[in-house]
Amino acid sequence: MAGSPGQPGSPADPASPGDPDDLADPLAGAHGDPLGVVLRTTPLRESDLLVVLYTDRHGRVTAVARGARKSRRRFAGALSLLVLARYRLGRRPRGELWGLESAEVVREWTHLASDVVAVAHASYVAELVDALLPAEAPEPRALEIIVALWDALAAGGPSPAALRAVEIALLDLAGHSPAIERCAACGRELGPGAVFDPQRGGAICRGCAATSRATGVRPYDPGTREYLREIAGRDGPLTARAVDADPRFTAADRTAARDALVAMITGLVGRPLRSLEYLAKLGAAGRRAKD
């Protein structure tokens, strides 16, 4: 699975993700070092790591962790996926790369490492944040979204609806909130014959659909629209997961919604996301196992 920031370790306390006493308002970031998560890591030279972080104060930053591949004690398990930590960062004037001096784990969800699909969902969201949000443009809401997804995974395992909620929220933060209920071109309510055009911002009414001829345009049925509307109306991935069990929606609705959002994301990023390819392989393997 490409894009995964290292192999998660074992948690010191498996119950910690659900324990409110672990930290007081961990996302507030009122003092101390920046709070953040690892999006990905790349080996650098013999003993260093190039670490891409998303922090509450600096947004997405790239830092060099000297000696991180030889000494685990210095960074105390904070360079893994599914870990929220405080990172001590420094940078020379006019320097491009930050230096990561040390880190302290604040909260961890690494007990999820045994669930390959949960790790795949977490890796996908890390790649989404890395790809969609600009460097060094802090958006604390992005960190909240990542943590909320991890909480949803810990609460009940992988959830397609929770993942759709994260996609919608991150697209919104990136300035490309998908049109779901009204036409992205004219603003009118949707009716029969609507399509979803990723390049034009989402839903397109029948009257405007004649000019939607680009690759990726697809039918936008009422069931798909209602499914996305229901998810967008929820308060984040933890509550959105309830939509998975809603009998109003069919497997076709869920698949169409997923494909529509993925097409929009892929168009914005300009390349396929490697973590999505891995998720597709996991899905195919699961279907074969049921046959």
Where are these regions (language model features)?
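Non-catalytic alpha-helical scaffolds and adjoining flexible linkers that form interface surfaces
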Residues: 1-49, 54-291
